[in-house]
């Protein structure tokens, strides 16, 4: 049976190179569960805050930043206290709150895709940059779409790539990408990268223009009146 528990779960994400150290100070895991240090990618542990009588939690080694990170899951009634405990535990490491703008910038820098931007049901997984999630070799059983996906993998038409833009003007979702007069791609996401100190973007581009070092132009206004070199 499937049960909708959306209104019974709150989530706090703690991300960054010090996240493990912070959680290790705060989280109690029973002997039957993996510790924070033992958690592998995409795995979770059932645990509590501080001790056996503490707030019950699920902590997963997941996130959307490209960094070492974890997500802490609890009942909504405990969420404010869990937040306060995390902030207190992370004082020494400089833990600070961050919102969606920071999260979006980090995931673009890491090349992580967002539904509605990099894919929307009109692209196959290989065009969307998540071909690794398609078990063409590891799953022998047939599944819906397997044959066509095998064909698309062998004959890709487009590819998701990263662009470095020249100048201070940013690109945004939907901006067209050109080589000369021809449109060869579209910007799916863009931001000013704090790490690189330059504007960057994710772009779905025709396969023949997807090699690193290829020079293109991002079209603004109508795509022709104004261009940004990339």
Go through the PLM ranges and name each one.
Residues 1-230:
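Conserved, structured C-terminal
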């Amino acid at each position: 049976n499937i049960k909708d528990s959306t209104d019974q779960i709150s989530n706090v994400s703690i991300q960054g190179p010090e996240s493990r150290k912070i959680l290790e100070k705060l989280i109690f895991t029973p002997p039957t569960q993996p510790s924070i240090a033992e958690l592998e990618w995409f795995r979770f542990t059932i645990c509590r805050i501080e001790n056996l009588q503490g707030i019950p939690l699920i902590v997963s080694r997941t996130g959307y930043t490209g960094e070492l990170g974890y997500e802490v899951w609890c009942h909504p009634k405990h969420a404010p206290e869990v937040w306060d405990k995390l902030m207190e535990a992370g004082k020494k490491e400089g833990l600070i709150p961050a919102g969606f703008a920071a999260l979006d910038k980090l995931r673009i820098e890491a090349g992580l895709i967002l539904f509605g931007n990099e894919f929307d049901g009109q692209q196959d997984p290989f065009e969307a940059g998540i071909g690794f999630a398609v078990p063409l070799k590891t799953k022998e059983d047939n599944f819906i779409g397997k044959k066509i996906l095998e064909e698309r993998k062998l004959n890709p038409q487009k590819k998701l790539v990263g662009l470095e833009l020249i100048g201070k003007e940013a690109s945004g979702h939907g901006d067209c990408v050109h080589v000369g007069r021809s449109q060869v791609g579209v910007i799916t996401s863009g931001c000013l990268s704090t790490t690189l100190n330059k504007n960057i973007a994710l772009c779905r581009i025709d396969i023949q223009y997807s090699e690193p070092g290829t020079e293109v132009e991002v079209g603004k206004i109508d795509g022709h009146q104004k261009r940004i070199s990339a």
